[in-house]
A protein has these predicted regions:
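N-terminal exported-region signature
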Residues: 1-147
Length: 147
């Protein structure tokens, strides 16, 4: 878990000299998890890391390695689950190299969540198939897909 500094910091501007942050795994929470684009002051964020280490949030740019955001799921099949307030997109049907699979891991669930949808291995990606777990405090649930 990390929190913001006194001004917003774009995720791609986070200094990560040891390359410890798993790409694509910085999440904010607002009733359901979302991929954060910026770290806002006073808010908490969950991230997945390969190892212990240090990162730096700064309102000024650093000339060191920053967090790389790469989408390895471009062109994959999608399943969007929505309750009209929150939505999540799950991906399947495309091979992602082993070293990039952790980029699609999700933070742990907790009982007070308003909405969450994920494959049961806590991922938003499955190569071919997977069982889906849903938390939904709303009576509606809409599924949309692209294949």
């Amino acid at each position: 878990m990390i929190t913001g500094i006194s001004s917003p910091v774009a995720v791609e501007s986070i200094s990560d000299p040891g390359s410890i942050i798993v790409s694509g795994t910085i999440y904010g929470y607002g009733g359901s998890y979302y991929n954060a684009e910026a770290i806002e002051p006073g808010k908490g964020y969950w991230l997945n890391a390969f190892a212990d280490g240090e990162i730096t949030l700064s309102s000024t740019a650093f000339a060191v390695k920053t967090v790389e955001q790469v989408n390895h799921l471009e062109g994959s099949n999608t399943l969007e689950l929505s309750n009209g307030i929150h939505s999540t997109t799950l991906y399947f049907g495309k091979d992602v190299a082993e070293e990039h699979r952790n980029s699609y891991s999700l933070p742990p669930t907790f009982p007070q969540m308003a909405f969450d949808a994920r494959f049961t291995d806590n991922m938003r990606y499955a190569k071919d198939l997977g069982e889906i777990s849903v938390i939904n405090t709303n009576k509606d649930l809409t599924l949309n897909y692209t294949v």
